[in-house]
A protein has these predicted regions:
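Catalytic machinery of carbohydrate-active enzymes
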Residues: 1-370
Length: 370
């Protein structure tokens, strides 16, 4: 008889264990000449949400500065009502064709604003290339902060953390610039309109405070292997029904079929809100839930902005690098030989198929009624 793979548990202490260098390369908060700052952060939803903790520390370090954010169009709505930023602007740098036109537009936007400090929280090949062009044009500020020890950055940490969680990599960037670390959870600013609309949605389905659990059961269309599977989630519904709970499904267009498959198995106990919420309504709903079960997906990071206990199921992705922030978040992963493969396709999907609802249940946070 083949032994079962061990189910591994990951908390913040497991995922954020890299030793950070507290050496200050340049103490930027003490520089009175810094009046206007640009933060660059593109990436996926999860990466964006994690970076909001870093953005908060930047805001706290420069309380009088004018702060701008450059992000991707898909995430602009997360910051529309964010009082930390005087300006949030986007250029679609992913468009094909028209890429070079977008690059020229981006360079012109940055040059026109005459920033005193630019903080590159993206620090990938594309952002480095654009900042290099900006410097060669003579339009870059003297203060360019990034986590890569190469041109074009004028300030960067002395050590690299290639295997660390993205949150710690960004923290290290702040430390070398003398920016204190004070924020350790996502920091989103939700407008009253989103709170009200989410409340109306819950009331319309008679969903009371702490009377339901949330399943974040999908993923981006390109990350199908990160899904635990509709059958597993449908089977898990019964566990919560026995405790007098209803189940709410949240997700976007890429997750419609997954949510329909689950809801069709339990029409009396599942409320399918997939595709019916804005991004900022997700944490509002999750804050009202008794518990959350999620895949490694961007919406799990939105949910981590709340205090609701959440279990995140990982398989092909490394929980040490993708776990959402928060002591209330537990990441689980079967210790199979092929874990952390990051494959987009898989013929056996052992990391998810072998993790049955029966094995998962003992690790779930017990939902408490209001």
């Amino acid at each position: 008889m083949t032994a079962q793979a061990k189910l591994m548990q990951y908390r913040d202490a497991d995922c954020f264990g890299a030793t950070l260098d507290h050496t200050i390369v340049r103490d930027l908060p003490r520089d009175p000449a810094i009046k206007r700052i640009l933060i660059i952060k593109w990436g996926g939803m999860g990466d964006i949400v994690i970076s909001t903790a870093i953005m908060e520390d930047i805001r706290l370090a420069f309380p009088q500065a004018e702060l701008h954010l450059n992000t991707m169009p898909a995430w602009q709505s997360l910051f529309t009502h964010d009082p930390r930023f005087s300006r949030v602007w986007c250029v679609n740098l992913q468009q094909q064709p028209g890429r070079w036109r977008a690059y020229r537009q981006w360079l012109a936007e940055v040059a026109a604003m005459q920033y005193d400090l630019m903080i590159d929280l993206q620090t990938n090949d594309k952002s480095r290339s654009l900042l290099t062009m900006l410097r060669l044009m003579g339009k870059a500020p003297a203060l360019l902060l990034g986590n890569h020890p190469r041109f074009p950055y004028t300030i960067h940490q002395r050590q690299r953390l290639p295997q660390a969680h993205g949150f710690q990599i960004m923290q290290q960037t702040l430390l070398c610039a003398g920016i204190p670390l004070r924020t350790f959870a996502p920091k989103l600013h939700t407008p009253p309109s989103s709170v009200a609309s989410a409340g109306q949605l819950l009331a319309g389905h008679a969903l009371q405070h702490k009377s339901f659990v949330v399943f974040l059961c999908g993923s981006h269309a390109s990350g199908q292997t990160k899904r635990w599977g509709a059958k597993h989630y449908a089977d898990l519904v019964a566990h919560y029904v026995q405790q007098g709970m209803r189940v709410v499904l949240l997700g976007g267009r890429d997750e419609t079929e997954e949510c329909l498959a689950i809801a069709s198995q339990h029409p009396q106990h599942v409320v399918n809100l997939c595709g019916q919420t804005s991004l900022l309504e997700v944490p509002v709903i999750c804050a009202q839930a008794a518990a959350i079960v999620a895949n490694d997906t961007g919406t799990a990071h939105l949910a981590a902005a709340t205090s609701t206990p959440m279990t995140v199921i990982c398989g092909p992705t490394n929980p040490l690098r993708v776990k959402p922030l928060g002591q209330q978040v537990l990441a689980l992963q079967l210790d199979v030989p092929c874990k952390n493969c990051y494959a987009k396709q898989c013929s056996h999907h052992s990391c998810m198929q072998q993790l049955t609802p029966q094995r998962l249940v003992p690790y779930l946070a017990e939902p408490k009624h209001a």
